[in-house]
Amino acid sequence: MPRIIFPFESAHVHLAVEGSTGGTTLGLHMAADAIRDGGRVLWASPDMPDGVRFGQLFEHLSLADSSKFHAMNLVGNLSQAVDVLVETSTALPSVRLVVLDDWCAHSGRIPIDRINDMSKLASSLGDDISLLLISKAGINAGDSQSDLTVRGKEKMQQAGFQIWTLTRKQDGPKRTVTINDEIIECRIDDEGFVAR
């Protein structure tokens, strides 16, 4: 099955993920695509991606290409991390994607200062650099058709972010990626996200 190519070029994306369904994997999948297309990736998260999973998703890239993945530990003051990411995105040539994985708490409202930091980051990046924010979605306790809630959705949209979701309807490899209102049914495997 062919790997899915997600439309993230020059986009600012807030990806809300149902717990443990592959949000980091989706970010790595998109990172590998950005590198394959000649770009560099800046990755920031509290924990570095699993080395085995990284190897699987980057297996089709050369070792030289894999070195275009630049990771930093996202701990402490988010405003300072934003400044470092902006500075690095201009210092390194051909940065095409900046990813912040687990950039906010796993539950509750996303504080407005965090959203403001992400808005500042988005507006400070060059027009040819995409931004992907990965966070856990909330659980919907209301009458909505969806089981999850995109935390900070309205504020993120006001800041110019597209809203994507990643869900799993049942155990197993089948996943659903929703990009704005477009639904992509896919399967997760060693290579990343593939059509099903």
Task: Kindly give the residue locations of the regions a language model identified.
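A short, basic N-terminal segment
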Residues: M1-A11, V194-R196
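Conserved alpha-helical scaffold flanking the Walker A/P-loop in AAA+ ATPase domains
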Residues: P2-I5, V82-S94
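Conserved P-loop
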Residues: F8-V84
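Residue-level signal for alpha-helix termini/capping positions
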Residues: A32-R36, T90, S123-G126
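Conserved nucleotide-binding/hydrolysis micro-motifs of P-loop NTPases
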Residues: D47-D50, V75-L78, C104-A105, A137-A141, ...
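Structural motif
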Residues: L61-A64, T90, K155-M156
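P-loop NTPase motor core
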Residues: P93-A159
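Phosphate-binding/switch region of NTP-binding enzymes
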Residues: I129-R196
